[in-house]
Amino acid sequence: PVIECDDEIVANEIFEVKVGLGKEVAHPNTTEHHIRWIRLYFHPEDAKYPYEIGNFEFNAHGESSAGPNEGSVYAHHQVTAQMKTAQPGTLHAMAFCNIHGLWENSKELGIK
């Protein structure tokens, strides 16, 4: 997953974090091959455990009683979360592809 946000944020001010897949090459979004979920965590420096920021499920991939990919609704595998923190640390994103399994990425977050 690609994590997009400023490298440094202002302590205790809300900021946006975008997480998605396929920024350079589009990831398939079909009944047979899709991203099922994205999870975002923040691990403050010197903290023992991370905090879960969000758990996002994508449940529509063109399914239909008429058959695979015959439905008209597709959830897109990108999310925007808002958060704030007083500490620097690391953002961790995980995404699950029903074919290729778990993908992970991280990004350091500093405080101005």
Model region roles, listed by residue range:
Residues 20-31:
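Short amphipathic, basic-aromatic surface patches that mediate peripheral association
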Residues 32-54:
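Extended low-complexity, serine/threonine- and proline-enriched intrinsically disordered segments
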Residues 51-68:
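Solvent-exposed serine/threonine-rich low-complexity stretches and specific carbohydrate-binding patches
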